[in-house]
Amino acid sequence: MSARLTVRETADFLRTLDNVLILTHVRPDGDTVGCAAALCRALRALGKTAYMLPNPDITETYEPYAAPCWAPEDFVPAAVVSVDIAALNLLPDNALPYKGDICLAIDHHGSQEFFAARTCLDADAAACGEVMYEIVRTLTEVTPDIALALYVAVSTDTGCFVYANTTARTHRIAAALMDV
C-alpha cells in the first residue's frame, strides 16, 4: 500500500533524495513534461542530481522544455519519481525497467492506482502542474524556467483555461507563474 503524503511531506521527502530519475507518461502532454521539467530544475536548484528519462514519444512542441533535463544513457538512479501517471500501464516502454522502483508518484488523477511507495495526490487539481507548483514553491524559489514549465503544465491540462476543470485556484496559480 502506498503512503499518502501531503505537499509538505512530499517536499521534505524530495529533499532526502539524490540521483533522481523522473518518469513521464506515454503520449506525453504538457502536464507530464512540464511537471517533470519543473521538478528536475527544482531538485537541481537544491544541488541534487536529477534527470528526466527521455520519452521516445515526445513531440517537438514539448521537446524544448525536456531536452535540458534528459538523462544520459549511463545514468543510474538512486530514486525514481513519476509525475502525472495514474497507473503503471501508462509508462513508456523504456520506463518499464523502473516500474518496481518508483519511490514517489505525484499526480492529480482520481484513478490513481497507488503503485509507488509514496503518493502525493490532489484529485481536485485541474492539472498535475497545480500540485507540482505547490511542491516546488515549498522546496525552492520558482525561477522563470520552472514557472514556464509549470505554466505549460497547467495551461495544457485545462485546455488553455477553458475546460470545466479550470478553477479560481487554477487562475491564481497561472497568475503567480506569470508574475515570476
Go through each PLM region and give its residues.
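Active-site cofactor/cluster-binding pocket
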Residues: 63-118
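General alpha-helical segment detector with a strong preference for membrane-spanning helices
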Residues: 33-35, 88, 111, 161
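Anionic-ligand anchoring segments at beta-strand to alpha-helix junctions in alpha/beta enzyme folds, i.e.
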Residues: 17-78
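Short, glycine- and charge-enriched coil/turn segments that flank and shape catalytic ligand pockets
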Residues: 47-49, 95, 99, 138-142
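Short, surface-exposed, polar/charged, turn-prone segments marking secondary-structure boundaries
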Residues: 49-52, 78-80, 108-111, 130-134
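Hydrophobic/aromatic residues located in beta-strands of well-ordered beta-sheets
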Residues: 50-52, 103, 150
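A structured phosphate/pyrophosphate-recognition subdomain
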Residues: 2-26, 38-44, 113-180
